[in-house]
A protein has these predicted regions:
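Glycine-anchored helix-breaking recognition loops at helix->coil/strand junctions
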Residues: 1-14, 42-51
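Non-catalytic DNA-recognition/assembly elements of restriction-modification systems
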Residues: 19-139
């Protein structure tokens, strides 16, 4: 008992949940599907050299950046940390593939040294030390 936090309705009313357009909701839903697949105990490893939980941690990093952009869009654009502009075309290019292939290709895309999302994630501490770096360190 007492494992899960309990909230009262009045506490949830002040919780800052963003209302986002349907087209953006789909992106978050896709990433959630990827994570649920990767964390299934009975799913095969997508890559022979990398455990699914390792892939999931990178997908969580991308998803975190997307969430930050929901709440700090202007700031992220000002300091060149916005990522949705890069994630959107990749997701669109993967949409007709099986989920395993989507995850594999997203991971391989993200692992490239020139990947803008990956580079921006690594720049959080220097470009946004007082906002995003503080949040990111607590995740």
């Amino acid at each position: 008992r007492g494992i899960f936090p309990q909230f009262k309705i009045n506490e949830l009313e002040i919780f800052p949940i963003k209302n986002i357009a349907q087209k953006n909701q789909i992106k978050f839903s896709i990433f959630s599907d990827f994570l649920m697949y990767l964390y299934q105990q009975n799913s095969n490893n997508i890559l022979s050299h990398t455990d699914n939980t390792r892939i999931a941690s990178h997908i969580e990093d991308i998803l975190n950046m997307m969430v930050y952009e929901l709440y700090f869009e202007e700031h992220m654009k000002e300091v060149d940390l916005d990522v949705l502009q890069f994630v959107t075309p990749v997701l669109e290019s993967l949409q007709n593939l099986p989920i395993e292939q989507q995850i594999k290709e997203l991971y391989e895309w993200y692992q490239k040294p020139e990947n803008a999302v990956r580079q921006r994630l690594m720049l959080i501490d220097t470009r946004s030390p007082d906002i995003l770096a503080v949040i990111h360190k607590s995740v």
